[in-house]
Swiss-Prot record:
GO BP annotation list: regulation of DNA-templated transcription
Identification of the protein by name: Uncharacterized transcriptional regulator MJ0767
Claim: Secreted is one of the keywords in the record: no
GO molecular function, one term: DNA binding
UniProt keyword annotations, A-Z: DNA-binding, Transcription, Transcription regulation
Disulfide bonds: none
Organism annotation: Methanocaldococcus jannaschii (strain ATCC 43067 / DSM 2661 / JAL-1 / JCM 10045 / NBRC 100440)
Lineage: Archaea, Methanobacteriati, Methanobacteriota, Methanomada group, Methanococci
């Protein structure tokens, strides 16, 4: 059995409610099991970006399309165009009824360069969601 260490994490009440719903819906035995699973997936998805090798992948970002965010994303596109193979964009309405922009990048190149690009995306103000998938 794996040696497990206990830590403490604080969440807003609304997020705990959502976590509890996922635990019940997906059949997890506890919040801890769900959170361990989520952290494990995060580490696995991001770990290939720490190696210095050629990889391919997809980066998804959903954000509030403010002037500042649109300008920042445009700047990032030009700064990192050597790893961007294609880009698909759409304006959508979120489940909360807010307007958002979705950008899906297909990327290929040195994992360190892709990591730098993704780290900049993570800093976008008004970001609703982001994800990187490396294969």
């Amino acid at each position: 059995m794996v040696n497990v260490e206990r830590i403490s994490i604080s969440f807003p009440k609304f997020l705990l409610k959502e976590i509890d719903e996922v635990v019940k819906k997906k059949g997890y035995s506890s919040r801890s099991e769900l959170i361990r699973d989520a952290v494990r997936k995060y580490v696995l998805e991001n770990n290939p970006l720490n190696k210095n090798e050629t990889v391919s992948g997809i980066i998804i970002v959903v954000y509030n399309p403010t002037k500042e965010a649109l300008e920042k994303m445009s700047k990032l596109y030009f700064e990192h165009n050597k790893v961007i193979k294609s880009l698909n964009q759409a304006y959508v309405t979120t489940s909360c009824g807010k307007n958002a922009k979705v950008e899906i990048f297909v990327v290929e190149g040195n994992s360190k360069d892709i990591s730098k690009f993704y780290e900049e995306i993570e800093k976008i103000n008004g970001k609703i969601y982001d994800k990187v998938i490396i294969f």
